[in-house]
Regions:
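Structural motif corresponding to the intra-repeat A-B loop/turn of tetratricopeptide repeats
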Residues: 63, 100-101, 135, 180
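Catalytic-site signature of metal-activated, phosphate-bearing donor transferases
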Residues: 1-68
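"A position-specific structural signal for the A-helix of alpha-solenoid helical repeats
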Residues: 55, 92, 127-130, 134, ...
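Start-of-helix register in tetratricopeptide repeats
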Residues: 51, 84-88, 123, 163, ...
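TPR-repeat structural position
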Residues: 32, 66, 103-104, 138, ...
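Short coil turns that delineate tetratricopeptide repeat
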Residues: 47, 81-84, 119, 153
Length: 190
C-alpha cells in the first residue's frame, strides 16, 4: 500500500499499542537475523522497494549488526522517497557510525548532515551533544544541546523522540554548562 503524497497521519488520543514479549517469536534470539534474511530475499525480487530496504536496516540494527545496518540505512537514504524516512535513515546511519567507533570527524559530519536535512528535529543535535560530551568537548556540546533545547516538538510522524525535544536536550545543555563553568545556568536547567 502506498499513499501519494504521504500523510496526513493524525494521532488518535487515548489509544496505544500494548506490546508484550510472550510469544515464541519474541523469545527467539535470532528473530531479527531471520527478519533480515527474509527482507534480503524480498529485495532480490523487488530491489527498488524502499519499505523493504528500511526494515532491513531496522532489522540489522535490532540484531546488533551495526555495520550491516549502516550500509542498509545509507542505501535507504539514497533511494529517496518519503522525506521523514530518508531523514531517519540518515540519522540512524550516523548513530551506527558512532556505535562502530568511527573517527570523530565522520561521526560529527554524519550527525550534522542529518540535522541539515531536517533542522526541525532535535534528535541529531542531542545525539551530537551527547557524543561531544563523551569526548569532553564541553563547549561544542553546549552549542548543539542549547539549539536542540530551543526547538519545539517536531510535528513529523515518524519516530519523534519527545524526550530528545524535551528533557534530554535540557540535560545535555545543563551538563555542558556545568563543565564550561556556567553552574548557575546548569542549576536552573536541572
Amino acid at each position: 500500500l502506498e499513499l501519494d503524497p504521504p500523510g496526513p497521519y493524525p494521532r488518535v488520543p487515548g489509544f496505544w499499542i500494548d506490546v508484550t514479549t510472550e510469544g515464541a517469536r519474541s523469545r527467539d534470539p535470532r528473530k531479527f537475523h531471520k527478519d533480515a534474511a527474509l527482507l534480503q530475499a524480498a529485495l532480490q525480487r523487488e530491489p527498488g522497494n524502499a519499505r523493504y530496504q528500511f526494515y532491513l536496516a531496522q532489522s540489522w540494527r535490532d540484531a546488533g549488526e551495526w555495520a550491516q545496518a549502516r550500509a542498509a540505512y545509507r542505501q535507504r537514504a539514497a533511494m529517496g522517497g518519503w522525506e521523514e524516512e530518508v531523514w531517519y535513515s540518515r540519522f540512524e546511519a550516523a548513530r551506527m557510525d558512532e556505535l562502530l567507533g568511527e573517527p570523530a570527524a565522520q561521526v560529527i559530519d554524519a550527525y550534522l548532515a542529518a540535522h541539515d536535512q531536517r533542522p526541525q528535529r532535535a534528535e541529531p543535535l542531542v545525539a551530537l551533544a551527547s557524543y561531544l560530551r563523551g569526548q569532553q568537548r564541553w563547549a561544542s556540546a553546549r552549542v548543539f544541546a542549547e539549539r536542540a533545547a530551543q526547538l519545539p516538538l517536531a510535528t513529523d510522524q515518524l519516530f519523534v523522540d519527545a524526550a530528545a525535544h524535551g528533557w534530554r536536550a535540557r540535560d545535555e545543555w545543563a551538563l555542558a554548562c556545568y563543565y564550561t563553568g556556567d553552574r548557575a545556568l546548569a542549576g536552573r536547567l536541572w
